[in-house]
Amino acid sequence: MAALATSQLATSGTVLGVTDRFRRPGFQGLRPRNPADAALGMRTIGASAAPKQSRKAHRGSRRCLSVVVSATGSGMNLVFVGAEMAPWSKTGGLGDVLGGLPPAMAANGHRVMVVSPRYDQYKDAWDTSVISEIKVADEYERVRFFHCYKRGVDRVFIDHPWFLEKVRGKTKEKIYGPDAGTDYEDNQQRFSLLCQAALEAPRILNLNNNPYFSGPYGEDVVFVCNDWHTGLLACYLKSNYQSNGIYRTAKVAFCIHNISYQGRFSFDDFAQLNLPDRFKSSFDFIDGYDKPVEGRKINWMKAGILQADKVLTVSPYYAEELISGEARGCELDNIMRLTGITGIVNGMDVSEWDPTKDKFLAVNYDITTALEAKALNKEALQAEVGLPVDRKVPLVAFIGRLEEQKGPDVMIAAIPEILKEEDVQIILLGTGKKKFEKLLKSMEEKFPGKVRAVVRFNAPLAHQMMAGADLLAVTSRFEPCGLIQLQGMRYGTPCVCASTGGLVDTIVEGKTGFHMGRLSVDCNVVEPADVKKVATTLKRAVKVVGTPAYQEMVKNCMIQDLSWKGPAKNWEDVLLELGVEGSEPGIVGEEIAPLAMENVAAP
């Protein structure tokens, strides 16, 4: 598996980071408390004395969930910032990355914090009693910082009514709007608040849970920003802090998880961001769409890319796609060709997805027992969803968010073509846009003995499908990395996938799955050529099920190391290139996964 690659335009003066002309100081105007804070205008209340962070003298404590194998340095201070953080909040791959990568970095000896909104009254997060007042638009907003220490990571939650009062009950899609595809009108204010609060957290939170570190993180920090919601952080870092001699060597890495969501707003809204005018050019953007307004706009992701010191994304092939042209770079391809972009394949949570211990399976298994156990799990799955129980009938699973990116409409259009020629069963699982939910149910009504559609969130069924299905269909129009195919391989289920993004980097034709070719990125139409690709490839794969070649594919899938260990090392190598003062290589460590879910959110 290709784990790390760099895509870069071969032109004079272009490097992976951002050239010095984009690294500009600025001004800031938040409410001052004392002369020291006046430079920031940030008011902090209730924080205990915050000495410089130090490494604790004893390394023998077993309070953290990692084992040190050999030490090679003192590591880095890493602060990940994102709108999602699994399992507390998640709508897709962004939440999974911020849930899984930080513990792997901590296991390698780095001090790691993740900052995300407090969308719910999480049972395991405690009020630090630290309060800050932050200027957003024309008003000062008071935020509190909640904290828990899990799997070697400081999890920090920003508490404010803009987050907590909008998201009642289970978070799901309500992080960004009341319904799938609908945004809250104040998302700019919400995520401006997140960015500014995240910059305060390492300086003012006196955290002492880690057996190896104590006190605040200090100012020698690498901020790892994720997607458009954090696009302002580098701007605020330069204008509010570095121009005043604070965070002098701190750097920002900006990771793109999905280029299709960019944070485009009216150009007039720039004035509400409280940034110097010299940042305007980084936000300035014109496209051919009339939403949210026609004509000139600001683009948060564009600014995040230009103002960052390093730009990354979640797979090497997706990095190549992003700079290939407007269609797949979503009109930011020219910007990324300027800055350069590095792709690192994601890992997955191998403790949550483990066929040897999975409590949802009828029969647990490993690579030595997979073939018989998968047949038994198939029979249990067929019975569970109401399909005829027959282990000899090939079973195809489709699991995904029901939105254009995942191509549920393409999959649905291909089903009649598949069933005309093949004796096969298909189970469809997903929630999302109502039009796609109706499409799924229509297939079940049309083919009652062959198709089952489950249009609700059902985690146990997802696990059962991974174990019981013969093939996993992934019909994404684009897929930055993809998690579903990693989960499938973990359970010995070959993937039949579109040839895009991380699917290219992780699925090997004839070894761990089947490639159907690249599908059109036009989300407004279902191309007949794409339907043919899906149907033809699935029919080809179905014919392989049950053969010695298929049995070999099952084994090939299960021998893969899909954990975060390898990606974490690649991330370390890239972040060390930033040269933040005091940063050193970490240690060679191994995280010990918790035996049970530690972090349970209140419903």
From Swiss-Prot:
Phenotype for residue 45 to V: In strain: cv. Iyatoma Mochi, cv. Mochimugi-D, cv. Shikoku Hadaka 84, cv. Waxy Oderbrucker and cv. SB 85750
One family name in Pfam for this protein: Glycos_transf_1
Transit pept. (range): 1-70
Effect upon mutating residue 61 to N: In strain: cv. Iyatoma Mochi, cv. Mochimugi-D, cv. Shikoku Hadaka 84, cv. Waxy Oderbrucker and cv. SB 85750
Gene3D superfamilies linked: Glycogen Phosphorylase B
Entry keyword annotation includes Plastid: yes
A molecular function GO annotation: alpha-1,4-glucan glucosyltransferase (UDP-glucose donor) activity
Positions with a binding annotation for ADP-alpha-D-glucose: 90
Alphabetical UniProt keywords: Amyloplast, Chloroplast, Glycosyltransferase, Plastid, Starch biosynthesis, Transferase, Transit peptide
Membrane-spanning ranges: none
HAMAP family linked: Glycogen_synth
Function per UniProt: Required for the synthesis of amylose in endosperm.
Matches recorded under PANTHER family: GRANULE-BOUND STARCH SYNTHASE 1, CHLOROPLASTIC/AMYLOPLASTIC, GRANULE-BOUND STARCH SYNTHASE 1, CHLOROPLASTIC_AMYLOPLASTIC
Family statement drawn from the similarity comment of this UniProt entry: Belongs to the glycosyltransferase 1 family. Bacterial/plant glycogen synthase subfamily.
The protein, known as: Granule-bound starch synthase 1, chloroplastic/amyloplastic
